[in-house]
């Protein structure tokens, strides 16, 4: 008998307690759950810090079930320090859960849930890194010690602490890079430093077209941009991110994208410049603690990595009620604008905060 089968011994009994039929064995079954550590929480990204088997429930942030899932597979993954040893494998869907195995190599991956036609119905970011620490800033907001997607919080600017890029309001990350791409075109580094699952017929690409949220979910690797080079949405929607965590918030469980008010303490950020007045690094200190901000740049309206030497971070806030614009923090040289304007189609880093709401 399998571990998921149960035997029920049943007999019919009359009102006076007499048996009216013989007892019978009735065998039933209950579908076994997937093995592995349950990552818990409802989120669009999950932190994994040790090798092993893991699983999570296929729900949105609000707890609602995601329908039409038939299977799951990995979509893309970073190559890590050893490209012959994939960072994630054995992705499987069963009974409202997705399971996978992590090799222990740090990096990032996206897992996609698929319908019967192999179309993506939802996807999740798997962030393989040591457990991020937190730090309280001057205004009382508690921040993560690294950019979303970074595998290091150490001082310096290198690909381990750079993090991933996000178009405002989208839950899925875009791989970064290590140098400007205005000559090579968008995603030149992403194409060499990530492995893409050939079974899912996806690739890193830029598309000059405004779309709706449903299309962005189906094509998480497509960097869309509308006709005005401002928003990736055909019709703007300022509610996709908020100071209450939404279904499209990309931060892990227990964290969310900060509002413009919550991130204002960073105006005290400091910088070290090189001989060309480009920032070598930025840092913020409060109450004898210091955290670092790599000068990584951003992705522009063509999806290209530009402005290396600056820090560009999204907030969840709309920018002064301007359509299709949101507030982003811009650190460039000794200049810091905590109310910088950013078209929602551009790609910027995120520094998640502890979600106390």
What name fits each language-model region?
Residues 20, 143, 291-293:
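Short, isolated positions in well-ordered beta-strands
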Residues 148-150, 222-357:
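C-terminal, surface-exposed recognition/capping segments
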Residues 13-18, 116-117:
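Short, solvent-exposed loop/turn segments at the edges of extracellular beta-sandwich modules
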Residues 7-13, 110-112:
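Extracellular recognition modules
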Residues 5, 21-22:
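Extracellular/luminal regions of secreted and cell-surface proteins that mediate adhesion/ECM remodeling
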Residues 25-245, 319, 344-346, 350-357:
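Short, compositionally biased
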């Amino acid at each position: 008998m399998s571990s998921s089968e149960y035997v029920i011994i049943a007999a019919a009994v009359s009102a006076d307690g007499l048996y009216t039929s013989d007892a019978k064995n009735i065998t039933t079954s209950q579908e076994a759950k997937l093995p592995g550590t349950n990552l818990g929480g409802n989120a669009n990204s999950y932190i994994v810090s040790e090798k092993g088997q893991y699983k999570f429930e296929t729900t949105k942030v609000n707890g609602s079930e995601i329908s039409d899932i038939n299977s799951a597979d990995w979509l893309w993954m970073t190559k890590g320090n050893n490209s012959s040893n994939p960072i994630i494998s054995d992705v499987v869907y069963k009974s409202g859960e997705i399971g996978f195995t992590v090799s222990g190599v740090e990096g990032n991956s996206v897992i996609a849930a698929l319908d019967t036609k192999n179309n993506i119905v939802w996807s999740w970011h798997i962030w393989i890194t040591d457990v991020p620490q937190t730090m309280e800033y001057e205004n009382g907001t508690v921040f993560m010690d690294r950019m979303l997607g970074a595998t290091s919080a150490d001082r310096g600017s290198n690909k381990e602490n750079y993090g991933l890029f996000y178009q405002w309001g989208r839950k899925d990350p875009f791989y970064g890079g290590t140098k400007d791409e205005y000559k090579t075109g968008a995603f030149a580094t992403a194409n060499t430093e990530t492995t893409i699952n050939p079974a899912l017929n996806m690739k890193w690409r830029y598309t000059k077209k405004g779309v709706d949220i449903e299309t962005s979910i189906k094509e998480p690797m497509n960097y869309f941009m509308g006709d005005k080079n401002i928003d990736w949405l055909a019709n703007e929607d300022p509610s996709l991110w908020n100071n209450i965590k939404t279904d499209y918030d990309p931060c892990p469980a227990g964290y969310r994208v900060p509002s413009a008010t919550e991130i204002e303490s960073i105006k005290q950020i400091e910088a070290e410049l090189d001989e060309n007045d480009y920032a070598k690094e930025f840092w913020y200190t409060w109450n004898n603690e210091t955290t670092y901000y790599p000068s990584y740049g951003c992705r522009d309206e063509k999806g290209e990595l530009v402005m290396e030497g600056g820090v560009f971070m999204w907030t969840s806030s709309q920018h002064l009620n301007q359509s299709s614009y949101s507030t982003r923090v811009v650190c460039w040289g000794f200049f810091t604008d905590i109310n910088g304007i950013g078209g929602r189609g551009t790609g910027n880093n995120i520094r998640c905060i502890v979600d106390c709401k």
